[in-house]
């Protein structure tokens, strides 16, 4: 299938000159080291906060860009060797109108909220996001600057399927509300260095007014979010994420007079360094994972898309993202075991995943005969390798290789295969102009039928400024 798209949209005028910078370079703070740690009760009354770094210069982004906020906001940042502590006093002239609900984790988007963005590698591409509403309900995720719309139709650049451990609490009072956060350094990935320089953005949303305010000002003259963030400096040493987690699981079933049928499983996670993590799973038990939302499967041209929720596949998932979505881990249905290595060293991000699947999805190509019978009772070995090299501000070049071998048993895994290799990249030319591309080839074989190498490609050139958006794209998909 070939798709050609050329979209021109605008309101007033367009200029091909580079837009002015947002001035976030002036928003640089150094976190204050302090002790003893505060009690995370949402009150902001501990002496710890008296010595914390203060952020009180906030600016509107919506509805009036650059305007003064309708309500005052003060943020406090401090740390010790184990945790980063963030407190916020959100003043409100009408506290009874604050929108806050007790809801499930990661579902605070309809409420007033405080959001913290931590770009721990300061590469302007990816940030950890921590959110809390005035009731203390948490939300966390990973923000990816150039995340594209996936097959399920989603487009949010915050992937909330990522969950980590952090503490929050909040209180509503007659002045507005206060929140406190404790973010363990073990929950983050960051460079192995004595001095840390992170990207930082603090956001407050006043829902009833549709008002967004930021510590580091945002401008529509700049195409990008993290490039407009401020800077947080932390003087180490910090407790690194060299942690070791072991999670053994035992489930079983016994019916009537039958013997008890045990089903053991094991999950291991090891933080090799503060920015490199290894995972191992053996016979994983996914029975406690939240069920998928129902979808209509009648008259569907393509297979249904379901989001990934299984913990083993979520660690470092953003590393495997590509403009054309090549890696869909839900196709690994019933892994007997799997290993994974993800992280970043210097300017290089890497990901490797290998899994042995006892019920793999079919390799879908035109064949002579019945496709299902040719692959029935197969087993599968899936290997995925991903490498991304940072070049300069918001730009990278990446490579991806995937290999899926299936057959009836470990010794016959070369009967069928699907292999994909490709290169992709993203380049920022100035504040408003970007270019991204991906070129891949795939080769499949089922029984005696082989496809040869099948190409696919995507090119996107965009120029987004305050009043005009220009996008030119070309896609060729088999």
Language-model regions, residue ranges each:
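Bacterial N-terminal signal peptides that target proteins for export
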Residues: 1-8
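Bacterial N-terminal signal peptides
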Residues: 9-17
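Structural preference for beta-rich elements and adjacent junctions enriched in aromatics
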Residues: 21-390, 395-399
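Outer-membrane beta-barrel translocator/channel fold
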Residues: 142-144, 288-309, 316, 321, ...
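Transmembrane beta-strand segments that form the barrel wall of outer-membrane beta-barrel proteins
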Residues: 246-256, 264-266, 350-358, 369, ...
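Alpha-helix capping and helix-loop boundary segments enriched in small/acidic/polar residues
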Residues: 255-259, 300, 329, 371-378, ...
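Transmembrane beta-barrel architecture of outer membranes
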Residues: 259-267, 277, 334-338, 378-386, ...
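Short strand-coil-strand connectors
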Residues: 344-346, 430, 464-466
